[in-house]
From Swiss-Prot:
Main location: nucleus
Domain of life (superkingdom): Eukaryota
Subunit-level organization: Interacts with SMAD4 (via homeobox DNA-binding domain). Interacts (via homeobox DNA-binding domain) with POU4F2; this interaction suppresses DLX1-mediated transcriptional activity in postnatal retina and enhances retinal ganglion cell (RGC) differentiation.
Family the UniProt entry places it in: Belongs to the distal-less homeobox family.
Name recorded for this polypeptide: Homeobox protein DLX-1
Location in the cell: Nucleus
Species classification: Eukaryota, Metazoa, Chordata, Craniata, Vertebrata
UniProt keywords, alphabetically: Activator, Developmental protein, Differentiation, DNA-binding, Homeobox, Nucleus, Repressor, Transcription, Transcription regulation
Keyword hit for Repressor: yes
Length: 44
């Protein structure tokens, strides 16, 4: 579970980073912060 969560978090970070780079907007960081918790809730 730990490894899966870590992988999911890494994937989410990569996606968030890609979106942030593409969007280049300030409202992106907040979303990135909200993504990890959502992923964890779904994984659990």
């Amino acid at each position: 579970k730990l490894m899966k969560q870590g992988g999911a978090a890494l994937e989410g970070s990569a996606l968030a980073n890609g979106r942030a780079l593409s969007a280049g907007s300030p409202p992106v960081p907040p979303g990135w912060n909200r993504i990890p918790p959502l992923g964890r809730a779904q994984e659990e």
